[in-house]
Curated annotation (Swiss-Prot):
This is 1,4-alpha-glucan branching enzyme GlgB. The gene is glgB. GO terms for biological process: glycogen biosynthetic process. It catalyses: Transfers a segment of a (1->4)-alpha-D-glucan chain to a primary hydroxy group in a similar glucan chain. GO terms for molecular function: 1,4-alpha-glucan branching enzyme activity; cation binding; hydrolase activity, hydrolyzing O-glycosyl compounds. Keywords: Carbohydrate metabolism, Glycogen biosynthesis, Glycogen metabolism, Glycosyltransferase, Transferase. Monomer. It comes from Yersinia pestis. CDD domains: AmyAc_Glg_BE, E_set_GBE_prok_N. InterPro entries: A-amylase/branching_C, Branching_enzy, GlgB, GlgB_N, GlgB_N_E_set_prok, Glyco_hydro_13_cat_dom, Glyco_hydro_13_N, Glyco_hydro_b. HAMAP family: GlgB. Coiled coil: none annotated. The active site is at 405 (nucleophile), 458 (proton donor).
Length: 727
């Protein structure tokens, strides 16, 4: 009897509408022997070659002029390794048949991917250079359970979706194919016939490299090698360690002066690393470097979560960039965006014709503020895609920490939505229980699998337990940005000094909740855009007062409990708002004796002072590490507090937020002795008026502020001073 494929099936296969190509193509054992089918459009002649001896076994018959070939071997019953000798125009070419290879995905991987608990989904999905049965090539795998057909397309097959349709693993909705002869650097996409019969051309969600906008293809790129962590890097992230973060947008920190073009990862590795080290920061935080189609999103609308943007170079270049920071003793934090993604056609949107990665209901799946789509955290495969990506950056690039963007938008279903525009959870509440479960799982997994690596939450509400362990009901982050402290203190500093006495509580309120979370004090990129003005420009007064206010504020911040974060340009008091399309105003530092240089020197000294004196950081999250000395002097706008470390060392910070010098100002202290002035923001070195306490002062046995000892101080105008008790 005939075993020829049905004519309708052949037509569907040739037209690219057949979803089970492996049932037809390749070598099959039948009751009449072996049957070999191949779809090779434009081929003139095809021979079957036995790989073991190179002998031509049979010529395939052109069954359909559109390129469908078939051969019957009635004398052979068992399958064997083979190749095709194909004549396209003139010279024959020996090629491997992708359809002679068996399934790629192992059962355990299939199970874990479907369950959403595969630690490294990026090792199985996407495109992977490999050798299979002695043949070099690339294995492709993509999740598209509702697609009718999925093909790999690229330059290697003329972007023709008919040539390389994939195998569907029905148990998990993953399509897979091994393509021999494909090499690193080649472009590819997935051509999907979706559930509605529409053709969609999609970039690989798991691609390790992608084209830069406006191009949208993925690139074959090797999976980066594992980067081991180190004890020093782990300790640098610890709650008891000094953490001073320099936040950077790589595309606008510095640019080529001749053409305003970006610096490459390699150029940044030389210039930025040296600068961050010189300034004394312990960490650098990068605005998102995942591939993204829109420059104006600053990276916060990524589509290629697994691909470092090619704006600045290759994945290898970025890996070298991170390694250069590590060699300098600086930890690297990456801003990470698992909350939403843009709706660009080549991306995740309606990936297989359905709302696959996003929620189907726009009341859940559409973010009206940003015109983006929200991940469906209720799907195992989506959670796995995101959690695996977090681990990928840490394991494969050595990223030391992730700062998760816009956590509030993830955990609240009614975030920025009016009544009736959101869907309650199962219990009728406003919390997104699926997103909360995802964050807990991701944070816990990182803690177990990558000890010493940490996560930081930009969470703008009072959601309880952000930095508590998931086991006791927390979200499991290590740190949380203190948005309330930032807003309160900036609002205070914007007041004219004569009015500050009426807003005294803005500077003290933060200590009422300082120990509810592990806080970072952020002056981030969000505070110098969208008409908010620069930090310097928010300060009141004439030019001298603006700079003095800023110096006093920075010194107050560096002494206050909580880790520190400062956005680039703020360290030298850039006067304009941040513009992502140009370099920072480095020319402001041309005058070494100018005010901008003075602020830069202050920030550098603050960092070195902060790292040198343990009272400023060791007990950030212990109430015993802080004590108010002067908290209620509204009239003079003076604040004084003491910082203490585990060994009992003490440092006092005193701020005078008026332009009036305070002479003979008495401050009560717990212990008497000699106090050395280790920092004064009014120093002439920082372009201040150089008023102070002549380097140090002895205490008096005079009771004040409920203490038996006190200091009689000179408080410079609009300034903060640090006094270290010497043993």
């Amino acid at each position: 009897m005939s075993v020829l494929p049905d004519r309708q099936v052949i037509n569907q296969l040739i037209s690219g509408h057949y979803g089970d190509p492996f049932s037809i193509l390749g070598m099959h054992e039948t009751s009449q022997g072996l049957q070999i089918c191949a779809l090779l459009p434009d081929a003139r002649e095809v021979w079957l070659v036995e790989t073991e001896n190179g002998r031509r076994i049979a010529q395939l018959t052109l069954e359909d002029p559109r390129g469908f070939f078939i051969a019957q071997l009635t004398r052979r019953k068992k399958s064997f390794r083979y190749q095709f000798a194909v004549t396209w125009q003139e010279n024959p070419q020996i090629i491997e048949d992708p359809y002679r290879f068996g399934p790629l995905l192992q059962d355990i991987d299939s199970w874990l991917l479907a369950e959403g608990t595969h630690l490294r989904p990026y090792e199985r999905l996407g495109a992977h250079l490999m050798s299979l049965d002695g043949v070099s090539g690339v294995s492709f795998a993509v999740w598209a359970p509702n697609a009718q057909r999925v093909s790999v397309v690229g330059d290697f097959n003329f972007w023709d979706g008919r040539r390389h349709p994939m195998r569907l693993r029905r148990e998990n909705g993953i399509w897979e194919l091994f393509l021999p002869g494909i090499e690193a650097g080649q472009l590819y996409k997935f051509e999907i016939i979706d559930c509605h019969g529409q053709v969609r051309l999609k970039a690989d969600p798991y691609a390790f490299e992608a084209q830069m906008r406006p191009e949208t293809a993925s690139l074959i790129s090797p999976l980066p090698d594992v980067v081991k962590s180190s004890a020093a890097r782990q300790k640098a992230n610890d709650l008891c360690s000094p953490v001073s973060i320099y936040e950077v947008h790589l595309g606008s920190w510095r640019r080529h002066t001749d053409n305003n073009f970006w610096l490459s990862y390699r150029e940044l590795a030389d210039q930025l690393v040296e600068y961050v080290k010189y300034m004394g920061f312990t960490h650098v935080e990068l605005l998102p470097i995942n591939e993204h189609p829109f420059d104006g999103s600053w990276g916060y609308q990524p589509l290629g979560l697994y691909a470092p943007t090619r704006r600045y170079g290759t994945p290898e270049d970025f890996k070298a960039f991170v390694a250069k920071f590590h060699q300098a003793g600086i930890n690297v934090i990456l801003d990470w965006v698992p909350g939403h993604f843009p709706s660009d056609e080549h991306g995740l949107s309606t990936f297989d014709g359905t709302a696959l990665y996003e929620y189907a209901d726009p009341r859940e799946g559409y973010h009206q503020d940003w015109n983006t789509l929200i991940y469906n955290y209720g799907r195992n495969e989506v959670r796995n895609y995101l959690a695996g990506n977090a681990f990928y950056w840490m394991e494969r690039f050595g990223i030391d920490a992730l700062r998760i963007d816009a956590v509030a938008s993830m955990i609240y279903r009614d975030y920025s939505r009016a009544e009736g525009q959101w869907v309650p959870n199962y219990y009728g509440g406003r919390e997104n229980l699926e997103a909360i479960a995802f964050l807990r799982y991701t944070n816990k997994t990182i803690g177990v699998e990558r000890p010493g690596s940490v996560t930081m939450a930009e969470e703008s509400t009072d959601f309880p337990g952000v930095t508590l362990p998931p086991d006791i009901g927390g979200l499991g982050f290590n740190y949380k940005w203190n948005m309330g402290w930032m807003h309160d203190t900036l609002n205070y500093m914007q007041c004219d000094p004569v009015h500050r006495k009426y807003h005294h509580n803005l500077m003290t309120f933060g200590m009422l909740y300082a120990y509810t979370e592990n806080f970072i004090l952020p002056l981030s990129h969000d505070e110098v855009v969208h008409g908010k003005r620069s930090i310097l420009d928010r300060m009141p007064g004439d030019a001298w007062q603006k700079f003095a206010n800023l110096r006093a504020y920075y010194a107050f911040m560096w002494a206050h409990p909580g880790k520190k974060l400062l956005f680039m340009g703020c360290e030298f008091a850039q006067g304009r708002e941040w513009n992502f399309e140009t370099s920072l105003d480095w020319h402001l530092l041309d005058d070494e004796n100018g005010w901008h240089s003075g602020v830069q020197r202050l920030v550098r000294d603050l960092n070195h002072c902060y790292r040198q004196y343990a009272p400023l950081y060791e007990w950030d999250y212990q109430p015993a590490g802080f004590e108010w000395l002067v908290v209620d002097d509204h009239e003079n706008s003076v604040f004084a507090f003491l910082r203490r470390d585990a060994e009992g060392h003490e440092l006092i910070a005193i701020s005078n937020f008026t332009p009036v010098p305070r002479y003979h100002y008495r401050v009560g202290i717990p212990q008497g002795g000699h106090y050395r002035e280790v920092l004064n923001s009014d120093s002439a070195f920082y372009c201040g008026s150089n008023l102070g306490n002549q380097g140090g002062i002895d205490s008096h046995h005079v009771r004040s502020h409920n203490h038996e000892h006190s200091l009689l101080l000179t408080l410079p105008p609009l300034a903060t001073i640090y006094l270290l008790r010497e043993n």
